[in-house]
UniProtKB/Swiss-Prot annotation:
Substrate binds at H247, R326, H423, D424, D468, R472. Optimum temperature is 55 degrees Celsius for hydrolysis of alpha-cyclodextrin. Thermostable. No significant loss of catalytic activity even after overnight incubation at 65 degrees. EDTA enhances the thermostability, the half-life being 90 minutes at 70 degrees Celsius in the absence of EDTA, increasing to 360 minutes in the presence of 10 mM EDTA. However, overnight incubation at 4 degrees Celsius is first required for enhancement of thermostability. Activity decreases drastically at 75 degrees Celsius. The record marks D424 as: Transition state stabilizer. The active site is at D328, E357. It catalyses: cyclomaltodextrin + H2O = linear maltodextrin. It is an enzyme of class 3 (hydrolase). GO terms for biological process: pullulan catabolic process. Keywords: Carbohydrate metabolism, Glycosidase, Hydrolase. This is Cyclomaltodextrinase. Belongs to the glycosyl hydrolase 13 family.
Length: 588
C-alpha cells in the first residue's frame, strides 16, 4: 500500500459531526490500492487491565477521483467523544494508521497514538436551513425580467427587448414585473428566487450601491418589496437578496464625504485609503473591487462599518421577512465580520440562508460559524465542460464531481447552491452551440444531483447570449419566441425532483462512466428509494448496460411512466444521441 497517499485529519471534511449524535469519518487512499478498510474506535476513557478498549467497523467506499479512493464510517459515540484509527488491508498486507503513523498491529497501551474527536458539541454543528435541500431556485436580474410599472422606468429606457443590451442600457425591469409573473414561476415549479441587488445605485446591475437602506426608485419602493415577499410566501416561494458588503458604489454617502473632505473626513477609515488626495489614475490609490474606482472597498473591520452593515443585514430580514442573503465577493471580507454577520441574522431568523460567492475551495467559510453554502462553481465548470463543450470525458467528469463532493462535509454538499449560468456567464444554449439536446442534459444533471439547484432566468426557454452584457437580455415573454419543449422538460424534471426524495436528498454514486461512447450512469439513493440516471452524451445512438443486477426489481421509467419487471441479470438501455432516461428501482 502506498503510505504517502493515505491521509486523514481530524477536522473539516475528514472528521465532522453530521448531526447532534453522528460523526462522519473519512479516509483517503491511493486509487485502487486498498481492498478493505475498518475504523478502529473507542471512548478515550474506556480501559480494562491496562489496555484501551476499542472495536472495529467496516468503512464503505463512497467514491473515487482521478487519484484517490474515499472511505466513510458513520459512528454514534455514546459519550460524544472518540479516539480512532484505521485498519487497511490489501492482499496479505495489513496496516494500522494512526495520528502518529503506521503500525502492523493496533497499539493499546496509550490512546495518544490515535486521532481524536474531543467532544461533539451541538453548538459547533454545521447547520444549514433544512428547507434549502428541497428548494429549486430561479435567479432574476431585476432590470431585465419584466417591466411592471413603466411610470418608474429610468429616463431613456429602451422599449422592452427592442435591442441587445449594453453595459449602460436600461429597459425598465422592476419589482412589480416580478410580481406580475409569479404564476409563471409557480407553474415551472420554482420554490426560491434570488434577486441580484435591488438597492439604490446608478448602474443597471446595482452592484455599486449608493444607499443600502433604500430600494432603487427605478425598481419600486419598500411597499412593493413587501408585496413581492408576501405573494412569494403565499405561493411557497422563498426570497433571497444580494448583499454587496465588500465594496460600495462611488455615490455612497460616506465615500462622497471622503471625496469632499479628504483626510479630514470622519469616514476616511471606512475605506482602505493609502494616501490623500484620492486618485483613480493610473490605478486607484485606495482599495477597490478589482481595480474599479467606482467600487471602493469597505473596511469591514472598522466598528462603525461593521455596525452599519450588520444593521443593513438585519433590517431587511426584520422589516421584509426575506429568507436569505447572497454575499457578493464574500472571500475578500474578513472572517470575523462573517462570524458576527451569522450571529446577527440567525438570532433574528434562525432558518435564514447565508450563501457566499466563492469560486475556489471554500472550506474556511463552511465550518458552521460563517456561511450555510457557497455558489458551486466547480460543479458548474465540470458540467459545462462535459455536456456543453465536450472537452471532458465521462470518467474525468465523474472524478471531478467526486473530488468536489469529498472536499466538503456531507451536509455542506446538501445545501450547496448549484448554478449552471448566471449574470456573469454566457447563456447555456450559447455555450451548447445552439444544441437544445445538450441543454436538456445539463438541466437533467442539475436537477438530479446533490445540492440546491438554481436556474438563471430565461435559460429554461432557450434564451441566448454571450458574456456580460449579452447574457443580460430582456426576458422573452412572447410565447412564440419561447422554446416550450425545453420549458416542459425543465418543468417535468422539477416535478420529479419534488416527487422523489432520493433526487433531492439521496446519496449519489457513479456506477459507470464509459469514455468510448461517453455514457454516464449514476444513482441517487435515500433509504429504500433509488433512482438511476442514464445519459448518452454522444452524437450517436448507444446501447448502455445497466451496471446493477436488477433481477427481482421493478423499473419505472419516470419520463413515460412505463413499468416493467427486470428478469434478466443484465439489462441494456437503447438511447438516441444525447438521450437519457430515469428509472426508479423498486422491489417486487
Amino acid at each position: 500500500m502506498r503510505k504517502e497517499a493515505i491521509h486523514h485529519r481530524s477536522t473539516d471534511n475528514f472528521a465532522y459531526a453530521y448531526d447532534s449524535e453522528t460523526l462522519h469519518l473519512r479516509l483517503q487512499t491511493k486509487k485502487n490500492d486498498v481492498d478493505h478498510v475498518e475504523l478502529l474506535f473507542g471512548d478515550p476513557y474506556e480501559w480494562h487491565d491496562g489496555a484501551w478498549q476499542f472495536q472495529t467497523m467496516p468503512m464503505r467506499k463512497t467514491g473515487s477521483d482521478g487519484l484517490f479512493d474515499y472511505w466513510l464510517a458513520e459512528v454514534k459515540p455514546p459519550y460524544r467523544r472518540l479516539r480512532y484509527g484505521f485498519v487497511l488491508r490489501a492482499g496479505g498486507e495489513k496496516l494500522v494508521y494512526t495520528e502518529k503513523g503506521f503500525y502492523h498491529e493496533a497499539p493499546s497501551d496509550d490512546t495518544a497514538y490515535y486521532f481524536c474527536f474531543p467532544f461533539l458539541h451541538r453548538v459547533d454543528l454545521f447547520q444549514a436551513p433544512d428547507w434549502v435541500k428541497d428548494t429549486v431556485w430561479y435567479q432574476i436580474f431585476p432590470e431585465r425580467f419584466a417591466n411592471g410599472n413603466p411610470a418608474i422606468s429610468p429616463k431613456g429606457a429602451r422599449p422592452w427587448g427592442s435591442e441587445d443590451p449594453t453595459p449602460t442600457s436600461f429597459f425598465g425591469g422592476d419589482l412589480q414585473g416580478i410580481i406580475d409573473h409569479l404564476d409563471y414561476l409557480a407553474d415551472l415549479g420554482i420554490t426560491g428566487i434570488y434577486l441580484t441587488p435591488i438597492f439604490r445605485a446608478p448602474s443597471n446591475h446595482k452592484y455599486d450601491t449608493a444607499d443600502y437602506f433604500e430600494i432603487d426608485p427605478h425598481f419600486g419602493d419598500k411597499e412593493t418589496l413587501k408585496t413581492l415577499v408576501k405573494r412569494c410566501h403565499e405561493k411557497g416561494i422563498r426570497v433571497m437578496l444580494d448583499a454587496v458588503f465588500n465594496h460600495c458604489g462611488y455615490e455612497f454617502g460616506p465615500f462622497q464625504d471622503v471625496l469632499k473632505n479628504g483626510a479630514a473626513s470622519r469616514y476616511k477609515d471606512w475605506f482602505h485609503i493609502r494616501e490623500f488626495p484620492l486618485q483613480t489614475e493610473p490605478r486607484p490609490n485606495y482599495d477597490t473591487f478589482a481595480f474599479v474606482p467606482q467600487m471602493p472597498k469597505l473596511n469591514t473591520a472598522h466598528p462603525e462599518v461593521k455596525r452599519y452593515l450588520l444593521d443593513v443585514a438585519t433590517y431587511w430580514i426584520r422589516e421584509f421577512d426575506i429568507d436569505g442573503w447572497r454575499l457578493d465577493v464574500a472571500n475578500e471580507i474578513d472572517h470575523q465580520f462573517w462570524r458576527e454577520f451569522r450571529q446577527a441574522v440567525k438570532a433574528l431568523k434562525p432558518d435564514v440562508y447565508i450563501l457566499g460567492e466563492i469560486w475556489h475551495d471554500a472550506m474556511p467559510w463552511l465550518r458552521g460559524d460563517q456561511f450555510d453554502a457557497v455558489m458551486n462553481y466547480p460543479l458548474a465548470d465540470a458540467a459545462l465542460r462535459f455536456f456543453a463543450k465536450e472537452d471532458m470525458s465521462a470518467s474525468e467528469f465523474a472524478d471531478r464531481l467526486m473530488h468536489v463532493l469529498h472536499s466538503y462535509p456531507k451536509q455542506v454538499n446538501e445545501a450547496a447552491f448549484n448554478l449552471l449560468g448566471s449574470h456573469d456567464t454566457p447563456r447555456l444554449l450559447t455555450v451548447c452551440g445552439g444544441d437544445v439536446r445538450k441543454v436538456k442534459l445539463l438541466f437533467l444533471f442539475q436537477l438530479t444531483f446533490t445540492g440546491s439547484p438554481c436556474i438563471y432566468y430565461g435559460d429554461e426557454i432557450g434564451m441566448t447570449g454571450g458574456n456580460d452584457p449579452e447574457c443580460r437580455k430582456c426576458m422573452v415573454w412572447d410565447p412564440e419566441k419561447q422554446n416550450k419543449e425545453l420549458y416542459e422538460h425543465v418543468k417535468q424534471l422539477i416535478a420529479l425532483r419534488k416527487q422523489y426524495r432520493a433526487l433531492r436528498r439521496g446519496d449519489v454514486a457513479f456506477l459507470a462512466a464509459d469514455d468510448e461512447v461517453n455514457h454516464l450512469v449514476y444513482a441517487k439513493t435515500d433509504g429504500n428509494e433509488t433512482v438511476m440516471i442514464i445519459i448518452n452524451r454522444s452524437n450517436e445512438a448507444a446501447e448502455i448496460p445497466m451496471p446493477i443486477d436488477a433481477r427481482g426489481k421493478w423499473l419505472v421509467n419516470l419520463l413515460t411512466g412505463e413499468r416493467f419487471a427486470a428478469e434478466a441479470e443484465t439489462l441494456c438501455v437503447s438511447l438516441p444521441p444525447y438521450g437519457f432516461v430515469l428509472y426508479a428501482v423498486e422491489s417486487w
